[in-house]
Each structure stands twice: as structure tokens, then as C-alpha cells.
């Protein structure tokens, strides 16, 4: 496995790993919805996903921004932070 992933930046690998984890959680939730075959339970599972999705997004963005923070000015970091906040506000309202 090290041979296959040897040239990949560790930060990019971490970010991609978080996205794979997120997709596994989503797939598991879909299977749970199908197995339970109940709308009420499906809504509960879906509400849990509403928490997991933004959490993975925030962690992934934090990992990436932490890695490139030294290369960016404070103004650009503020713009990125503002953009992330606006994305989260748009999703939840």
C-alpha cells in the first residue's frame, strides 16, 4: 500500500480518507434505511447524517487550511473562513 500511496501528500491523503469515511457512513445509513423499511426510522437516520456531513466538511477544511495557512495572507484566511461559514449557513437555513 505504501508503494501505491508513496507520492501522495499526507494532508491530501488525510482529507481523502475523511471523505471516504463520510461516504461509508452515508452508505451505511442508506442500508439501515432500507433494512428498517420505516419512514420514521429513516428520518432519524437522515437527521444524524445532517450532523455528520457538516462535521466531516469542517474537519476536512480545517486540515487543508492548516496545511496551507503559512502560504496565505490573513485577508485570504478570513475570506476562506467567511466562505465556509456562508456555506454552512446556506445549508442549515
From Swiss-Prot:
It comes from Bacillus subtilis (strain 168). One of its GO terms (cellular component) is plasma membrane. This is Uncharacterized protein YqhV. It is a multi-pass membrane protein. Pfam families: DUF2619. The chain crosses the membrane at residues 15-35, 48-68, 72-92. InterPro entries: Uncharacterised_YqhV. It is found in: Cell membrane.
Amino acid at each position: 500500500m505504501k508503494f501505491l500511496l508513496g507520492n501522495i501528500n499526507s494532508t491530501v491523503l488525510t482529507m481523502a480518507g475523511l471523505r471516504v469515511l463520510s461516504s461509508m457512513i452515508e452508505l451505511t445509513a442508506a442500508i439501515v434505511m432500507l433494512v428498517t423499511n420505516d419512514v420514521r426510522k429513516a428520518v432519524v437516520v437522515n437527521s444524524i447524517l445532517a450532523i455528520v456531513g457538516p462535521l466531516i466538511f469542517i474537519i476536512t477544511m480545517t486540515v487543508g487550511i492548516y496545511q496551507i495557512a503559512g502560504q496565505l495572507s490573513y485577508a485570504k484566511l478570513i475570506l476562506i473562513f467567511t466562505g465556509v461559514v456562508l456555506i454552512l449557513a446556506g445549508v442549515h437555513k
